[in-house]
Design a protein with these regions (language model features):
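Short, conserved phosphate-binding/catalytic loop or strand-edge motifs used
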Residues: 390
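Conserved beta-strand/loop scaffold segments within soluble protein domains that form the structured core
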Residues: 96-379, 393, 397-420
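N-terminal amphipathic, basic helical "cap/leader" segment at the start of enzyme domains
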Residues: 1-128, 305
């Protein structure tokens, strides 16, 4: 794939010159930059991008939309948007939820201001690749002082019959003092077995006083090798409450970051992960405290089955000048197989004195006494293990603020465990 192909893609979609030029600059950087560092995860030989910027054809793997609640929703299959729903009262308040290129026409100044602002195009090789080659996406914009009580859904299906790269850029711009609850699904759909790559970047911009509840359930298929980056950038007194279920079937590296720029900003990152088969999942979860009295909490629990690998890196970094900041983290992994591999790495970087910080990490097998107790009550081994896993992950799931997300995450865990 040459720069000319990327230029043609920009022209075909009538992209503004600033974006077309940025794609070209990013392309030039790809070969000179290193891959991001995910400690103790060897992914340098993975195929995380084949250098194409094609679009998918309309798919037969399209869900039925005959019975839907009337709330804000967008659904894409591959690069195609197959459903958009914006209630009239929200549209009248200036709320926008649409595909990326439509948003470039509707709110061009905001896209130019915030696109690739929480992650820079030249941060690393995968960021540059994403900027040059992303082929679809979505934008959610909530104006200042708008509060949406109903959950907002962004559903992004990867077509299992297609080898078109699943390279999406998703932006959420939450205006000052706005309040939303957003649920995102990344999911392979269909019975196909085409091999594909995914490079997904999600930027959440929480402006001063904004409150964002962001939940995600990732269920990409075993033939999808993925890099998933979710980045939050928080203004004064803004908050993002992340709840992410990493339930993919293929090899995945993920980077979940929150930059607490504003004074009094607050980010909670709750991550639940399940690895099975021979898959490798490596997850970096980072909170960086820039603002005074900013608070960042990381809570992540994972379960490993069979010969899988799961790595948690929890990183708390308090920048010089962030007086009164607090960074706490906990990473725990439960192994249900003696052939599984795991790491849980707590990392604290403290550049300021007047702060508080702490960490905890553990890796362990299922407690034999727990299993004995449950099986002595008449449960078979598989059912007993499922209950132990539910209890282990439940301490994180119970902290998720949206009931529908809790229920769906539990159902997803049950589904994965039942395949054993």
């Amino acid at each position: 794939m040459t720069k000319e192909n990327i230029k043609l893609f920009s022209e075909m979609h009538a992209e503004p010159s600033w974006l077309a030029d940025l794609r070209q600059k990013a392309f030039d950087k790809i070969e000179t930059l290193e891959l991001p560092v995910i400690e103790r995860v060897k992914f340098h030989r993975w195929n995380l991008g084949d250098g194409t910027i094609t679009e998918s054809e309309p798919s037969a793997n399209v869900p039925d939309f005959t019975a839907l609640d009337n709330h804000l929703k967008l659904v894409q299959v591959g690069t195609q948007t197959v459903f958009e729903q914006t209630p009239v009262e929200l549209a009248e308040q200036g709320v926008v939820f649409t595909d990326f290129h439509s948003a470039l026409e509707e709110i061009p100044e905001l896209i130019e201001e915030f696109f690739m602002s929480s992650v820079k195009y030249d941060d690393d090789k995968l960021a540059a690749y994403h900027t040059a080659y992303f082929n679809s996406g979505a934008v959610l914009y909530i104006p200042d002082n708008v509060e949406i009580k109903e959950p907002i859904e962004g559903i992004f299906y990867q077509d299992s019959d297609s080898d078109v790269p699943f390279n999406k850029h998703i932006m959420i711009i939450a205006g000052k003092n706005s309040k939303i609850s957003y649920l995102e699904r990344l999911e392979s759909r269909g019975e196909g077995n085409a091999k594909a790559t995914a490079n997904i970047t999600v930027e959440v911009i929480a402006r001063s006083g904004a409150q964002v509840k962001f939940a995600a359930i990732d269920r990409l298929g075993e033939n999808v090798t993925a890099y998933i980056s979710r980045r939050g950038k928080l203004g004064n007194d803004a908050s993002i409450d992340w709840a992410i279920g990493v339930m993919n079937e293929g090899n995945v590296v993920a980077d979940f970051d929150s930059d607490l720029i504003g004074n009094g900003s607050h980010a909670d990152l709750k991550v639940v992960a399940l690895s099975s088969g021979r898959q490798v999942q490596g997850i970096d979860t980072r909170v960086t405290n820039y603002g005074c009295n900013s608070i960042g909490n990381i809570l992540q629990h994972g379960v490993i089955l069979e010969k899988a690998t799961l790595t948690f890196n929890g990183i708390g970094h308090i920048i010089k000048g962030a007086k009164g900041a607090d960074a706490q983290q906990e990473s725990r992994v439960l192994m249900l197989s003696d052939q599984a591999r795991s790491d849980a790495n707590p990392i604290l970087l403290i550049d300021e004195n007047d702060v508080t910080a702490g960490h905890a990490a553990s890796i362990g097998q299922v407690d034999p006494e727990d299993m004995y107790y449950l099986m002595s009550r008449g449960l078979d081994k598989a059912t007993a293990e499922r209950l132990v896993v539910r209890g282990f992950l439940g301490s994180v799931i119970v902290e998720i603020p949206v009931k529908e997300v809790r229920d769906e995450m539990i159902a997803t865990i049950e589904e994965k465990l039942s395949k054993r």
